[in-house]
Amino acid sequence: MRKRYMESGKVSALSRLGMRSKGLTAKVYVNLTMHNIVVTITAPNGDVLVKKTAGSCDFSSTQRSTKYAAQATGLAVGTRLKELMRTGGGAQVGGLVVYTKGIAKLRDAVIRGLASAGFRIEGIFDITPVPHNGCRPPKRRRT
């Protein structure tokens, strides 16, 4: 791999990943659980660039699973990536491919937050694990 150097002689983190001049597509992994939201942006080779949760965006326990928290988390991740691109020697991310796992009601809010940060969404994929009649579920709770 040929190294690209910045003016100061240092190699930027994004240029090492091959994203400086090409404007490649970054991958966004959104994990939506019942109690929290985790959004991770990775380079095409899998290196983590930015990671944020609803808890790190100052949402308390019950607020973390709301649509507002999902949109704010998506916006926070997008603005952090923009800041990384600006300080990383003019690196450009061409677009985002979103992989979601979990609750469907919060999915649109996270994508809306990423889009409002100014990124082009190139694809949305659902990777929620679905059992094909695997393990037997626990018996129902009696109250």
Predicted regions and their residues:
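Ribosome-associated RNA-binding proteins
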Residues: 1-143
